[in-house]
Swiss-Prot record:
Pathway: Cofactor biosynthesis; thiamine diphosphate biosynthesis; thiamine phosphate from 4-amino-2-methyl-5-diphosphomethylpyrimidine and 4-methyl-5-(2-phosphoethyl)-thiazole: step 1/1. Condenses 4-methyl-5-(beta-hydroxyethyl)thiazole monophosphate (THZ-P) and 2-methyl-4-amino-5-hydroxymethyl pyrimidine pyrophosphate (HMP-PP) to form thiamine monophosphate (TMP). InterPro entries: Aldolase_TIM, ThiamineP_synth_sf, ThiamineP_synth_TenI, TMP_synthase. Keywords: Magnesium, Metal-binding, Thiamine biosynthesis, Transferase. It comes from the Bacteria. Signal peptide: none annotated. The gene is thiE. 4-amino-2-methyl-5-(diphosphooxymethyl)pyrimidine binds at Q34, L35, R36, H37, K38, N66, S105, K134. Belongs to the thiamine-phosphate synthase family. GO terms for biological process: thiamine biosynthetic process; thiamine diphosphate biosynthetic process. GO terms for cellular component: cytoplasm. Binds 1 Mg(2+) ion per subunit. Its cofactor is Mg(2+). This is Thiamine-phosphate synthase.
Length: 210
């Protein structure tokens, strides 16, 4: 089950220990953790996944593995997040079954429609703002484009890309269910405090809409 909106998803940073970062983000109030480490081998990913899943259960949070359906299943993760060039969504759904979460990265309305059709439980949409973790040649889609996606799909949208404490409210106000961050937490002097501040900003958005 996707966390209640609005929520913070933290994606691990390859430059630091994913277990330490996940723990800090969870202690700061993150509701979802995604393990993303392109260069790690299967053995390392599995052991990280087992450890992070245990942390997520302790904090009643969702644990997602990036790309690797096999690791997600072996470690008992809550789900998997797939990119456009990863295992096809319909094939992944057959392996995952109906109970595990499947998210898909999208950057256009057509990709979002296809993701929902192929069984995605949520889409990660972006990049919303300029970011160092994505191809800088690609133009940011901007928070206003979230409304276009929300108008054509029924599954939750997680906004990603260049989100910081200064702009975190904009994707939520545009219709995103949550925000996903890497650097805003991982590269902060204190990742726990950074996560807590982002969660606080999201909570203020709830109060703003009352």
């Amino acid at each position: 089950m996707i966390p209640s909106s609005p929520f913070l998803c933290f994606i691990t940073d390859e430059s630091r220990s994913p277990i330490i970062l996940a723990r800090k983000a969870l202690e700061g109030g993150a509701s979802m953790i995604q393990l993303r480490h392109k260069s790690a081998d299967g053995d390392q990913l599995y052991h990280w996944s087992v450890a992070i899943q245990a942390l997520c259960r302790k904090h009643k949070a969702i644990f997602i593995v990036n790309d690797r359906v096999d690791i997600a299943l072996a470690a008992g993760a809550d789900g998997v997040h797939l990119g456009q060039q990863d295992l096809p969504a319909d094939a992944a759904r057959k392996l995952l079954g109906k109970d595990r979460i499947m998210g898909i990265s999208v950057s256009s309305p057509l990709e979002a429609l296809a993701a929902e059709k192929n069984g995605a439980d949520y889409v990660g949409f972006g990049h919303i703002f300029p970011t160092s973790s994505k191809d800088k040649k690609n133009t940011p889609v901007g928070p206003e484009s979230i409304a276009d996606i929300k108008a054509i799909i029924t599954i939750p949208i997680i906004a990603i890309g260049g989100i910081t404490g200064c702009n975190a409210q904009l994707p939520i106000r545009a219709g995103a269910a949550g925000i996903a961050v890497i650097a805003a937490v991982s590269r902060a002097a204190d990742p726990e405090i950074a996560a807590r501040e982002l969660v606080g900003i999201l909570q203020k958005n709830i109060e703003h809409n009352r």
